[in-house]
Amino acid sequence: METLRVLHNLIRWLILVFAFWTVISAISGLASKRAYSNSDNRSNLFFMIFMDIQLLIGLIIYFTNGWFESLKHIGESMKDPMVRFFTIEHSVMMIIAWILVHAGRISVKKAATSQSKFKKSLLYFGIALLIILIAIPWPFREAIARPWFRWF
């Protein structure tokens, strides 16, 4: 189980790299009015792939680590900030971000012009990135803090 937590932590950083790359690429593409490139496509493809891997690992952790069991006692679980965060908030926000990344990828692929691809990229992937940043249990978030890097 600890191996999955370490992987979940490390993949978070890959997701953030590709998310920022995708959003910055969309902003620069809109500003410069350049053509949508293979690099732009790859950034959101890798963003989506790592989100898929992260979701799979996260679901395994969720169902094997007892967070799902907390739903049986939802009233008590909601009183504890850490249990509430990992049982409801983190998982729901990350699933919403995952949906936005997939919807964004489909929408960008269907867009006819480079400018519309960049606009859709900025909208979908920008909102997904914002949700991800909110849903991560950063070390400075007192009740739910997790380390910057988790090692074995």
Question: Model-derived features: where do they sit?
Answer:
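Membrane-embedded alpha-helical bundles that constitute the cytochrome b-like, heme-associated redox core
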Residues: 1-152
